[in-house]
Amino acid sequence: MEEAEKAKRRSIELLNETRNCAYSSFVALAEALNISLNEDMKNMAIGFAGGISGSGHICGALWGSIAAASLYTMKMMGDRRKIQNPLERYMPVYAKCAGIYRKFVELNGSPNCGDLNPNLDLVSVEQRRKCMEIVSRAVEITLSSLKDQKT
């Protein structure tokens, strides 16, 4: 099975288990990208679901994607502590994450949970299905964006 398809399926599995979009995208991507996370690191994502704890702001699936992309990009760039200028040190991460953000918005219409899920409904079958599509798409966008960095 193709890596992206496997990661997308894993994100849906996690979403069904947890009902947490941020956790699902973050953990599925970390697994696909061979980023080790302990339970505390995984649990860090929980409060970002529902657009930051149900507030409707930045989509949790997008948050999880940006967090995983940041970890992966920093890992692939190696030690950059000697670069004194923080902007220069982190610019490749900013650029990669900005690209993921733009693609997510292009495909979903908004980065905000409140727009993607106007009633902040995490219960109905219809909305859960929509969230599954959004989480799966976020994982696919992220892996596609990062594929050129893989070693």
From Swiss-Prot:
Alphabetized Pfam families for the sequence: C_GCAxxG_C_C
Matching InterPro entries: CGCAxxGCC_motif, Multihaem_cyt_sf
GO cellular component, one term: membrane
Membrane topology designation: Single-pass membrane protein
Keyword terms, alphabetized: Membrane, Signal, Transmembrane, Transmembrane helix
NCBIfam families: C_GCAxxG_C_C (TIGR01909)
Name of the protein described by the UniProt record: Uncharacterized protein AF_0456
